Amino acid sequence: VNSNYTGGEPKRSRTAYTRQQVLELEKEFLFNRYLTRRRRIQHTLT
């Protein structure tokens, strides 16, 4: 095992959503099982 191997691109940091944002995401998920990254970002801006 090569200890210098990082696995490619670095991982993005995890987004912390407010309770309201989580509720909105869950509601949208009921209608659309796949939310694009753009759509998730839009929820963080509201």
Curated annotation (Swiss-Prot):
One of its GO terms (cellular component) is nucleoplasm. It holds the Pfam family Homeodomain. Keywords: Developmental protein, DNA-binding, Homeobox, Nucleus, Transcription, Transcription regulation. Transmembrane segments: none annotated. SUPFAM superfamilies: Homeodomain-like. InterPro entries: Antp_homeobox_Deformed_sf, HD, Homeodomain-like_sf. Disulfide bonds: none annotated. Its main location: nucleus. Forms a DNA-binding heterodimer with transcription factor PBX1. This is Homeobox protein Hox-D4. It comes from Ovis aries. The lineage of its organism: Eukaryota, Metazoa, Chordata, Craniata, Vertebrata. The gene is HOXD4.
